[in-house]
Amino acid sequence: MSEEFELDTDDLKRRMDGAMANLKTEFASLRTGRASASMLEPVMVDAYGSMTPINQVGTVNVPEPRMVTINVWDKGLVGKVEKAIRESGLGINPQLNGTIIMLPIPELNEERRRELTKVAGQYAEHARVSIRNVRRDGMDQIKKAKADGMSEDDQKFWETEVQELTDKMIKAVDAALETKQAEIMQV
């Protein structure tokens, strides 16, 4: 009989939380009908010879629910920031006002809303797969310990622990998806 098996559930939880954090980041980048500074996070500007995030070349503000402004610090970069936004695929048309770039956020049409809910669903599915992969790793550790002499009762206990953690995280993903889809479909 081997020594007492102790599954590192904290590690499994940390890895599952990482999948949730990644999902939230992906959800934040989805454009809903509301303005958000986080929608510009994936946009990179060719500044000073390297690709730089927009928030490092200017101040990003949300003065109104449907407006994002970027106060570019270096006047020479205004054109590059504008170009980066146009080419980003966000579907936003920047308007220049000196060193301030205004981004009016247009209303989403029904078709685009449906597309975005599908994209959100794909992001959620990726998160579920990541969580299930962590579950599989935990179950593999348990099976290995069983082969090394763990009792069947201990095996069942740890399998239940891992499954409960997985179920809890999958429910959190589903809840986050439901919230995001409602936010996207809100007119």
Curated annotation (Swiss-Prot):
<protein>
    <recommendedName>
        <fullName>Ribosome-recycling factor</fullName>
    </recommendedName>
</protein>
<dbReference type="GO" id="GO:0005829">
    <property type="term" value="C:cytosol"/>
</dbReference>
<dbReference type="GO" id="GO:0002184">
    <property type="term" value="P:cytoplasmic translational termination"/>
</dbReference>
<dbReference type="InterPro" id="IPR036191">
    <property type="entry name" value="RRF_sf"/>
</dbReference>
<dbReference type="Pfam" id="PF01765">
    <property type="entry name" value="RRF"/>
</dbReference>
<keyword id="KW-0648">Protein biosynthesis</keyword>
<comment type="function">
    <text>Responsible for the release of ribosomes from messenger RNA at the termination of protein biosynthesis. May increase the efficiency of translation by recycling ribosomes from one round of translation to another.</text>
</comment>
<dbReference type="GO" id="GO:0043023">
    <property type="term" value="F:ribosomal large subunit binding"/>
</dbReference>
<dbReference type="InterPro" id="IPR002661">
    <property type="entry name" value="Ribosome_recyc_fac"/>
</dbReference>
<keyword id="KW-0963">Cytoplasm</keyword>
<dbReference type="InterPro" id="IPR023584">
    <property type="entry name" value="Ribosome_recyc_fac_dom"/>
</dbReference>
<comment type="similarity">
    <text>Belongs to the RRF family.</text>
</comment>
